[in-house]
């Protein structure tokens, strides 16, 4: 099974919603990751046939479906909201797409409803109505309805976003095992980097209606090709600092460290490789908050004098907001509960091994200092906060 989008464009009210989207997705799960307003829901609505594109083609398993109506597309859609028929029981909600198909006998419908309900862990709730269910049970019902009828493409638009943490973790694990090896194309959208890493599936990063990158999520996390990709896979947000590469060193706020070799190795003039001597070039340094420490660092660690502005304690972590050089904001994510006094001075430490060096526009990763590669064979072990 394959879903192919070729040059798909969509413009509404004078704004570009989708800009030349070209993707080829095969059977199994693919993650669609990006911030709010990236175009994730819009892209799914176009694939489902709810929004006609202004240009481009959509094919499913070799058949052009660009102009095919919603009813005639072999597509199921699960929304972020718990969308179920309130007057129908769980059983009837799941059975509804099967009855519309009108090609299954009653016994076949009953068997399929019960199979899917058991798969989703709601087999004992078939007689209840949606109002009698918890949020997690309602979303399981919505997903069961989407799974009831075999489809070529299954679209899940942030299906866990409205659930509490415990339910989200439980259902995420269930969905991951359920869709591994699926014969359908399963496109799952999320704005949560941790969710993308947990599913360990091929990933499309979307931003401002454009495809930013396609690849393995662990590799993108370890060595993001652009600042936009790094930002999409970082929560809390990245810390960004201005820097200059000069004479083979990276300079930042009075500190410096040897410029690492270009990533990927440069095949163009020496100025593209920060480790080589060449004209000075402005760069952007990015570091994740959990790689900023307070109170000490090892050999070669960069030290930044800072003023404490705010300490946010969440229980498992303390987010320390700092001001560098009187103008730059830096956040340190520290383990556990730690107490700090706003207005006091401290020193923030960053190991250059955890810095990404981007060009001044953030459009290209120039270097990733000794950032260890993450095995794509065990992507689920990637820890977003450690």
Across the structure, where does each feature detected by a protein language model lie?
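Helix-to-loop junction immediately C-terminal to a conserved catalytic motif
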Residues: 48
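Conserved ABC transporter NBD signature motif
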Residues: 56-64
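ABC ATPase nucleotide-binding domain helices that frame the ATP-binding cleft
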Residues: 41-44, 140-141
